């Protein structure tokens, strides 16, 4: 919403009737539900077609990856191990988030961590996500490249595929 500086401002604008809707990340819908404000229209974690694709992906500069492949793989490994920890021990992760004040409200953090599909990286194909979003962007004229061209020229799944084998559950 124009004139809002933060998600809190956007939520306040919605709660006071100055906005008809608000886009929230994981915490905001939980907070608004607790305050009995509005209702969720689309939940990309559970509603199709969005729920079938990754909400977040890791991007890297091609030159950096070529110059520092070991560092790149280590960073990706750390992120995937963190995702596994979120999946296997959500309450421990929520406590960490609360202790470090990343999400100071333990209950909100716990609900968020438990609600997100952190283990999806093991089974889902990230290429499907790129294809899905590229098709939408291509359809509305925001990108000129085809999904196939974007995937061919802009993705490299080697590290991910290697780590899927290395980090078997």
List the predicted regions and their residue ranges.
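Short alpha-helix boundary/capping motifs
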Residues: 42, 60, 103, 121-126, ...
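Conserved C-terminal helix/tail region of periplasmic/extracytoplasmic solute-binding proteins
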Residues: 138-169
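Short, solvent-exposed coil/turn linker segments
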Residues: 42-44, 117, 125, 149-150
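Pocket-lining segment of extracytoplasmic ligand-binding domains
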Residues: 9-100
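Short secondary-structure boundary/hinge segments and terminal tails
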Residues: 31-32, 49-51, 115-116, 153-159
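A generic structural-conservation signal
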Residues: 23, 41, 107, 146-147
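Secondary-structure end/capping motifs
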Residues: 66-145
